[in-house]
Regions:
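Acidic two-metal-ion nuclease catalytic site recognized across multiple nuclease folds
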Residues: 3, 165-235
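Conserved phosphoryl-transfer catalytic core
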Residues: 451, 455-504
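Walker A/P-loop
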Residues: 263-281
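Conserved pre-motif I regulatory segment
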Residues: 227-268
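Conserved small/polar residues in nucleotide/adenosyl-binding loops
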Residues: 505-511
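A substrate-engagement module of RecA-like helicase motors
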Residues: 233-236, 292-293, 298-414
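Conserved non-catalytic scaffold segment of RNase H-like nuclease domains
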Residues: 2-115, 128-146, 150
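Walker A/P-loop NTP-binding motif
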Residues: 279-291, 310-313
Length: 511
């Protein structure tokens, strides 16, 4: 490997005729970063000597006519090699760009053996809440300028800004956390760990005012509650304060809700889709004095998360409403479990990267709700080891900061408590007084029946049921009871036979 400087990053983006083995370079963009600043950049078209397909033309804006007068790669290879040879090669999906450029340079007599950093991999670690990590989405989320997507130099400039953005975020982390990340970073693609290593070497020992350390984990301090602002009795004024447009049907719905709330009776009200019913019932409820607070239940966790992100955020920002989302314990990270897993050696690279993501997420979350982590579906085989079971041992290392316990405490004091039907019916079965002294609003109440049906259901293994029936028959003397047991046993065996027949039929059909 060449003697590459880890304080010199060479960010490269290539546009090519395809992403396959026969890909030919049609455009090169290079941005050089030294000591945290962009010091040089270079861009050029490359003549591929073959026509572009319509998809590539549309994607890049390049034409056959433009590339026909572009230089050969051999004419610019020396210039490109001088730029990239003694720095760390950086790209968004570095495998494609580095391998293709190395191949082109090799045929011109240059050997590219620089370390590689993948900004996709690094972004996945540092921004665990994101759902997607393509360059356009990252630039949009982080406010990075990307003037001409899929233009090599523009993409390289955006990737360089992204790298600087991520370095800045790393510098804001405590040195102890950087050390923990660095111990896991060998599992990142190629030499992506070098970015963390450089920041670690330059980072001071100063601690962050927003974080606190517990047994090597860095957790965000609880934010101070702001003094709530009083809502107007006028629905339209509240809508205006939220910077939303007034809608006649929504106003009519809100007035009806307000009238029903004043009557203090159990009431049902139907509203058509799309009129803005969430604000239509929340604002009238919040504008009324209520000692016990408001409990809102919605049909799904997806809708619960959506309301927290949209309506909940606006209400917090505008009126400083203390709103809390409450779910079952299995939705929260149990810090004791993660602590054990963190210190366990892993052979699975993705599992180790997920540990790094969680370490970053812990510095940002106040709830410990795992739904905040994007792409959580990719780690479903890992999650059961980490989730809370609703129990907290007195020997817990994190008893004072346990997310599930914190959620329960907040639920008691929050002005507006948001939950879902499944959790509500389960909670009421164990704690009937949960709704006492609260104004309860059931959104899409007709779907509460589904939650109640699911709660009432029990599951049995048919084989176990047959065994139990046979044991009962050995001792049962009553003739009617024996006939009932025999009938149940017959039906269970029939269902088992049908199941295996279907499996055999499916297998034969697949063959």
């Amino acid at each position: 490997m060449m003697n590459s400087r880890t304080d010199r990053y060479v960010v490269v983006d290539l546009e090519a005729t395809s992403t396959g083995r026969k890909a030919k370079i049609i455009q090169v963009g290079i941005v050089v970063i030294e000591n945290g600043e962009i010091v040089d950049q270079y861009g050029t078209d490359i003549n591929p000597h073959e026509p572009l397909d319509s998809h590539i033309k549309e994607l890049t804006g390049l034409t056959d006519q433009r590339l026909a007068v572009a230089p050969e790669f051999s004419q610019v290879a020396g210039r490109i090699f001088e730029l990239v040879k003694d720095g760390v090669f950086v790209a968004h999906n570095v495998q494609f760009d580095a391998n293709l450029l190395a191949e082109y340079l090799f045929f011109e007599g240059y050997e590219l053996r620089t370390p590689r950093v993948d900004t996709v991999e690094l972004a996945q670690v540092l921004y665990p809440q994101f759902e997607k990590y393509n360059l356009g989405i990252l630039c949009q989320e982080l406010g990075i300028k990307l003037d001409h997507a899929h233009t090599a130099l523009s993409d390289a400039q955006a990737t360089a800004e992204l790298l600087l953005f991520m370095c800045q975020k790393l510098f804001q982390l405590p040195k102890g956390l950087l050390e923990t990340l660095l111990n896991l970073a060998d599992n990142l693609l190629y030499e992506t760990y070098l970015v963390i290593e450089e920041v670690y070497q330059r980072q001071s020992l100063l601690s962050s005012h927003d974080l606190m350390e517990f047994h090597g984990l860095f957790l965000r301090k609880k934010s101070k509650s702001l003094k709530p602002r009083k809502l107007s009795k006028d629905f339209t004024k509240n809508i205006s304060l939220l910077d939303l447009d007034e809608r006649p049907q929504q106003v009519e719905f809100a007035e009806k809700v307000e009238q029903l709330l004043k009557e203090q009776k159990i009431a049902f009200i139907q509203a058509q889709t799309g009129l803005g019913k969430t604000y239509g019932y929340l604002l009238p409820a919040l504008s009324m004095e209520s000692e016990g607070g408001i409990l809102v239940s919605v049909p799904t966790k997806i809708l619960q998360n959506q309301i927290m992100q949209e309506e909940g955020s606006r209400l917090k920002d505008t009126f400083h409403i203390d709103i809390h989302s409450l779910k079952g314990p299995q939705n929260y990270l149990k810090l004791d479990n993660f602590y054990k897993v963190l210190h366990r050696p892993e052979s699975n690279r993705l599992f180790t990267r997920f540990k790094m993501q969680v370490l970053i997420w812990l510095t940002e979350t106040e709830t410990g709700d795992l739904d905040e982590i994007g792409q959580l579906y990719r780690y479903q085989h890992i999650i059961p080891e980490l989730v809370h079971d609703g129990k907290l041992s007195k020997k817990s290392l994190f008893s004072s900061e346990d997310f599930w316990q914190r959620s329960q405490d907040r639920a008691k004091s929050s002005r507006l408590l948001l939950t879902n039907h499944a959790y509500l019916v389960t909670r009421l079965e164990d704690d009937p007084e949960f709704v006492n002294n609260r104004l309860v609003i059931i959104d899409e109440a007709q779907k509460m029946l589904i939650a109640l049906e699911n709660l009432a259901q029990e599951s049995y293994l048919l084989d176990d049921l047959v065994t139990q029936v046979e044991k009962s028959l050995e001792t049962e003397k009553d003739l009617i009871q024996r006939r009932l047991l025999e009938s149940i046993g017959f039906e269970c065996r029939y269902l088992i036979d049908q199941f295996y027949s279907c499996l055999l039929y499916t297998s034969d059909a697949a063959d």
